[in-house]
Amino acid sequence: MKGRYPIDRQFGIWAKFTPSLSRGFLRLAAFFLPLMPKGLSDRRVNVTRVTFEKGGKALLIAAADCAENAPCLVCFHGGGFVFDAARYHYENAKRYALMAGCKVLFVRYPLAPGNPWPAPNDACLAAYRHALSHARELGIDAEKVAVGGDSAGGFLAADVALRAPEAGLPPPCFAMLIYPVIGGEETPSMHRFTDTPMWNARLNAKMWEYYAAGNQVILPGSRDLRAFPASYVETAEFDCLHDEGARFAERLAAAG
């Protein structure tokens, strides 16, 4: 039942909001989200538009005083593979740039249901490839390029980390996975959190319907993880994704 979870008051109205995944709502979101303020009009940061192959677009976000040849985080936003980035995604990217002393390549990838698997994954791998091949132009250190993302973005970050060596690319130096989508198995948290606000198991099932579109998606948890980069994995308390993220972290630890 909604409201039975002791969610912190700092979440405000979002503690009571659950999005629709109807195609009509997705069309509205696709129109309005890009028009929303991004919180990047800040003299502390410089923002540059970047385009690359596979239909991808990105923003390079860096502190105004960021040195050249800086580390870089290639960042993939969440949104269930169907929603564009929200303001808090951009604000988090800005925080990473300001607080970690790195540049952030914030990627906007093609969205389902119009662009199901593997289109988002291919665009994200292309963004990572672009960061490496254009490192000097972007002012980043090609040996210090990490990947990261939240929710669906965490899935895409893990996918890039696994596919990069297969594509003849150096692996990321690090992976930051924030309450990542992993998939592949039924978990207690998926059965328990069917009515949580913002995201729940019912929405998650619909997400997979749109993203997979009848294809057999290659999941991060089904892969050999022995070459996976050093990682940070975060899970959320009242989250249907909790257990799959925790189990993926356990598998990473076991793989060394």
Question: What kind of feature is each model-predicted range?
Answer:
Residues G12, L21, T48-R49, E53-G256:
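Alpha/beta-hydrolase superfamily serine-hydrolase fold, recognizing
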Residues M1-D65:
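A glycine/proline-hinged amphipathic helix-loop "lid/cap" segment
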